[in-house]
């Protein structure tokens, strides 16, 4: 059975639109998790395709400074897997949500219980950046009877054979990592990045979204040429924290991108 997230993003792709996913950190709001519905409604009204939500962890190996600091603020508001899931279970949204977190919080929660409880929310995708491909069977069997897709990350250093292995039977979308490093590190793209993304796009059977370091409308345009859309995190997290109202215009324009 094709997962809802895959179908939703494929529909946007068929309509000739670029897919736009904003990333936010759960609990990084002056109201803590109580502010999450407000942030999701704000993004939904701007026309985003889906929303990626970070669940904070104290040792976030893939996060750059902006998202790491947001995670610390969120932990300061006592955000946990249990409190986030409880909040999401009450949420009313038409958009599919994607949780990005590390394996440890899921393990501490209990793998079966985490997936079972997450399945009662609007979450349709799960990204675990520190879960090696070889260990994906810790999670995949638990997702078989759910409508939650495990989203694979593919880095620039991944060879073609390995790429094909990573994306085989993948659901949701392929998360193409645009830089070798952590999130938010913009302006340091490799010369062969576009070629790398084009090749990945050619072999993928589901949408390919480019993330890590994407921060300008020029980036949005560039990566929509060689993939199906973009994920923007650090820029949005920083703007929301600083109450920078100009972020709304950026999100709206990026979300309205036409191929």
Curated annotation (Swiss-Prot):
Pathway linked to the protein: Amino-acid biosynthesis; L-tryptophan biosynthesis; L-tryptophan from chorismate: step 5/5
Catalytic activity, EC: 4.2.1.20
A cellular component annotation (GO) from this entry: cytosol
Stored PROSITE patterns: TRP_SYNTHASE_ALPHA
Top-level taxon in the UniProt lineage: Bacteria
Keywords recorded for this protein, A-Z: Amino-acid biosynthesis, Aromatic amino acid biosynthesis, Lyase, Tryptophan biosynthesis
Single annotated GO MF: tryptophan synthase activity
Catalysed transformations (reactions): (1S,2R)-1-C-(indol-3-yl)glycerol 3-phosphate + L-serine = D-glyceraldehyde 3-phosphate + L-tryptophan + H2O
InterPro entries: Aldolase_TIM, RibuloseP-bd_barrel, Trp_synthase_alpha_AS, Trp_synthase_suA
Pfam families linked to this entry: Trp_syntA (PF00290)
UniProt-annotated catalytic positions: 52, 63
Family: Belongs to the TrpA family.
Functional description taken from the UniProt entry: The alpha subunit is responsible for the aldol cleavage of indoleglycerol phosphate to indole and glyceraldehyde 3-phosphate.
Subunit structure: Tetramer of two alpha and two beta chains.
UniProt-recorded name of the protein: Tryptophan synthase alpha chain
Lineage per the UniProt record: Bacteria, Bacillati, Bacillota, Bacilli, Lactobacillales
